[in-house]
Amino acid sequence: MFGSKEKEPQSSEGEVTPSNGSKTDLETGETGGLHRTLHSRHLQFLAIGGTIGTGLFLGSGKAIATSGPVGCLIAFVFVGSILFSVMTALCEMATYIPVPGAFTTYASRFIDPTLGFAMGWLYWFCWAITFALELTAAGLIIQYWNSDLSIAIFISVFWALFTALNFMPIHIFGELEMWFASIKVVTIAGFIVFAVCVNAGVGQQGYLGFDYWLHPGPFNASIVEGSAGKFVGFWSVLITAGFSYQGAELVGIGAGEIKDPEKSVPSAVRWTFWGIFGLFVSTVFFIGIIVPSDDPSLMLDSQDASASPLVIAAKLAGVKVLPDIINAVLLTAVLSAANSNVYSGSRILVSLANERCAPQFMTWTNKFGTPYMAVATTSAVGLLAYMNLSANGGVVFDWFLNVTAVAGFISWACINLCHIRFMDALGAQNIPRSSLPYTAPLQPYLSWYGLFFNVLIILTNGFAAFIDWSTSDFFTAYVSVILFIVLLVGHKLFNRTMPVKAVDADVTTGSLRATS
């Protein structure tokens, strides 16, 4: 029954054609109006642009101060291994069923419509709130040059700019995001070269080698003293590492708009993961050997260049011109991330609407294939950035960081679970995995590995609130979990959905490999 490998028919204009062979009218804004005009390079840089941002350029400094250079490095490698399990699992599903929104659809089809509903809305909330976070960060970064300017000006300007950009045809959007992301990649590559030179003795510190791994030391204790404190320090920065990596899974979000997904999605996933993993681990490693973890500047609450470990490294080396350059790059980084935030959030809304978990008008598209109602709704949440005008910017930044980071781990856990159920469905329906365009390695063990540690990090991320009880810290750590549970329970009570049996799971609709 599932032996045919013929691809799903597509129109000459490249629009997504449903598996039943019908084609929707792009002008009417009906479901299926998204265009397959993205190339693999667009998908790669879309994910890179959404990933490399404030988490790496700002959050990594505080992470090194908390856990020490080696503790932070191990944390980034460890979370990177979890991300690998997530991305390979997502790649297998997205290559076989390349639909807009990807994993929220998979949750509804393979596990339970309730999970798809809760996962989709939480993930949308995550990216919509992150858009507000990046707008706030952009204003704070510009204040580095002129603190008298109100960030409200820049929130307004950038909100209007990125809302407009996301109404453009997707291939133009993809090209713009590619150039945005390229600036960040070049910056990190340049910093690595700079760090090698500084470590070798070019700067005023002289030859460093691994001195900072010895003094003040490779690990820092947090909350408690001794070995237990060092482990606590390591575990406490996993959320920061997760926030930094969050966005790499965007290659799955764009699967419904990419040309030739059977080849393009695996290529995009491969280059995206190894590119992001290599850049992140290298950056954290080199920061750890040229900046001492006890440098007080690492713990600054500022969101401009003064708090960036890249700038701190330059100051320690005696390079005075670099802070302005890094601040400009930071601005580019957060603006690029903001651009992809609106894209990813809007496509999740389209996926939710296709699964009847959101109003159907979210699927309306214009002649360019842009889901304009979904874009407008996601962009509107960015206006919450104005809340920063009445509170300390650092407090807002930290609160949003924790909320979005935990929501990201929840999404990763759900992706792993979706893949496990996807493999169960294939087995129950006698579809050999060897017939898929791409098969994830080390399965099912790798997906179980990712699921276990994602859940463990989610449950333990707020442990500090229990050691020295703090209601605000508890709420910050678990508000995403609470919201997720409320969405699950609410949808289940109102809709009375039943878990999907493996033999009944829909593994054909939207598949580019037509059934026979």
Which residues does each PLM region occupy?
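Membrane-interface loop-to-helix entry segments
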Residues: 152-215, 246, 269-273, 401-414, ...
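Helix-loop-helix connectors at the membrane interface of multi-pass transporters/channels
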Residues: 104-109, 135-155, 252-262, 267-274, ...
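TM-loop-TM module centered on a large, flexible mid-protein loop between adjacent transmembrane helices
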Residues: 105-107, 112, 144, 218-225, ...
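Membrane-interface "cap" regions at the ends of multi-pass membrane proteins
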Residues: 1-61, 65-70, 83-88, 497-516
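C-terminal membrane-solvent junction of multi-pass transporters and transport-like membrane proteins
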Residues: 362-369, 412-477, 501-515
